[in-house]
Structure formats: C-alpha cells, structure tokens
C-alpha cells in the first residue's frame, strides 16, 4: 500500500513540473542568407543547377591537378561566387527573396596560352544570358594560400576571376613546353627549327603550335569551340560566329522556299516587301477597288469589311 502511494505521488510530481521552458531549447544560427533553389532538399532535382555539358578533362601542369575536386568561394556585394578548378564557376545571390538567383557562369573548357605560358583558364557554356552563354576567364596568380581573390564582369555575360595559389609562384610553374609528352616536344622543336630556317612564316608557326596544343588537349579545335545549343532551338544560339550566321541564313532560305510553295499550292499571290510603294511606307495607301473577299498573309480568308 505504501509503495503504491509513493508511486502515485511521484507521478503527480512529474506532471506538476510541466514541459521544459522554451528558453532551454537550442537555437541554430544561420550563417548565410537564403539559398532557396540551390540547397533546398525539398525541391525537385530539376530546380537545381544543371550544366549543359560535362567539363573538359583535367589538363595542363600536373602540379595543378590537386586542385581538381575542390571549390573556393568569395562573397562580393550580394553575390557568392564559387570556383571549382577544372569543373565550373557558379554565382549565388545572397538574399532573403524566395527566388534568389543562382546560375553557372561557365564550365571548364580550355586553357589560354600565350608566349609558351598558360595565361588563364576558360570556363564556357554557362547559363543563358540574352542570346549568348555566360563565360568566365580565370587568371592564376601567386599567393600564400589557395583562394578566390577577385571577381568582376568587364563586359556583359563575361566574367573575370583571379585565383591565388602558391602552386604558380615558381617562374616556370605555368610553362607549356615541360608539360608536353616527348613526342610533342620533338614536334615543337622541329617547328622552331623550321621557323629559324625560314621554311615557314610566323603565321604558319603560330598555326602549327596551335595544332600541337590541340593535340595535347590544352586547346579545343574550332569545331569543339562551337557554342553549345541553348534550350529553345537554333534561334536561341544568336549570331556569335560567322558559321552560325551561315547556318541561320541557310535555314531561313529553306523556310522561305517552303512557305512560298505553300502559298503557290493554295493559289495565294504574294509580293516582296521591297515592291511596296513609298506612299504605303508613309502610311498613305493607294486607292484600290474593294473586292468581296480580301486575302491575308495566311491561307485563311477574311470577309469584306
């Protein structure tokens, strides 16, 4: 009896204590503003950043390969930039808006080479920006630690990044020749000898070296440099190159021919825009006799007004 009474008193004491005070609960500190749309696990996978293609293979100086698989970030103004060597460059808007912008500023594409030196990393085929794709050039500079030091946008949709690393502090760290396999080094030696013997012109020398760098995988061929087609068809490519203009002209010519055939098939006359009189251009139409039915620019008919 006494034991049962003791248990009853114990239960009553616990219920009287009530729940723990709200102040005792732990609070999680959010270090960065909203990243909705990027790291939200409840969103479908399609809402996350999606690249148009895979990055190019890792290439260049072997001592830089250790940077592959790592990412370095920098917050400037209201944007967070992230550079992942040999992978991509991304931008994330730091805001509390539900639709904060996040996008890809470029995917690892090729090196830039000048005077036997790797002068920069090109990240191309980023997210759409008007009629073109965003792209970034990353300059490697000597520094005490690996860090993304600076980001700017010198022209619309083109970004310039400076990445500091102790891996490029040696004066020969970015030379191209030592990174080449023996066979390509011998080819380069022959090209230099031919130039010295005046067997090739400076222009020919430059062209041969470019081909050599393409064989090494440091530069892309002209065909590989064709812009990746944006979602929405060929019209969304824009006219970034002469080849694109030629392709677009050819497609438009075929479409015009097809439409003319349809008009002829349905017995609908058509005239060229250049045949319109000056008075019509000025808004004064030449008087015409009314007809019961007036043809429009499509196969349909419109009744008299």
From Swiss-Prot:
Gene Ontology biological-process entries: carbohydrate phosphorylation; N-glycan processing to lysosome
InterPro entries associated with the record: DMAP1-bd, Gtb1-like, Man6P_isomerase_rcpt-bd_dom_sf, MRH_dom, OS9-like_dom
Domain MRH: 69-171
Region (Disordered): 267-305
Stretches assigned to the DMAP1-binding domain: 176-279
Molecular function via GO: protein homodimerization activity
Post-translational modification remark: Cys-245 mediates the formation of the interchain disulfide bond for formation of the homodimer. Cys-142, Cys-157 and Cys-169 are involved in intramolecular disulfide bonds formation.
Protein name, UniProt field: N-acetylglucosamine-1-phosphotransferase subunit gamma
Species: Homo sapiens
Gene responsible for this protein: GNPTG
């Amino acid at each position: 009896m006494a034991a049962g009474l003791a248990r009853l008193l114990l239960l009553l004491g616990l219920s009287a204590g009530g729940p723990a005070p709200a102040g005792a609960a732990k609070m999680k500190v959010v270090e960065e503003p909203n990243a909705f749309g990027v790291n939200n696990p409840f969103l479908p996978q399609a809402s996350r950043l999606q690249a148009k293609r895979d990055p190019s293979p890792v290439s260049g100086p072997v001592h830089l390969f250790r940077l592959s698989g790592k990412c370095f970030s920098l917050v400037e103004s209201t944007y967070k930039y992230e550079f992942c060597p040999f992978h991509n460059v991304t931008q994330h808007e730091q805001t509390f808006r539900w639709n904060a912008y996040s996008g890809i500023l470029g995917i690892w594409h090729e090196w830039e080479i000048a005077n036997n030196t790797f002068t920069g990393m090109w990240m191309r085929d980023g997210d759409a920006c008007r009629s073109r794709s965003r792209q970034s050039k990353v300059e490697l500079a000597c520094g005490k630690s690996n860090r993304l030091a600076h980001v700017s946008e010198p022209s619309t949709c083109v970004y310039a990044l400076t990445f500091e690393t102790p891996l490029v502090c040696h004066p020969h760290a970015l030379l191209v020749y030592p990174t080449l396999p023996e066979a390509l080094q011998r080819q380069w030696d022959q090209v230099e000898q031919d130039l010295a013997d005046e067997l090739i012109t400076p222009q020919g020398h430059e062209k041969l070296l470019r081909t050599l760098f393409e064989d090494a995988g440091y530069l892309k061929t002209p065909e590989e440099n064709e812009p990746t087609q944006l979602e929405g068809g060929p019209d969304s490519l824009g006219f970034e190159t002469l080849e694109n203009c030629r392709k677009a002209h050819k497609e438009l010519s075929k479409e015009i021919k097809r439409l003319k055939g349809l008009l002829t098939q349905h017995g609908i006359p058509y005239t060229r825009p250049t045949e319109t009189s000056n008075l019509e251009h000025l808004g004064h139409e030449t008087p015409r006799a009314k007809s019961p039915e007036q043809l429009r620019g499509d196969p349909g008919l419109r009744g008299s007004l």
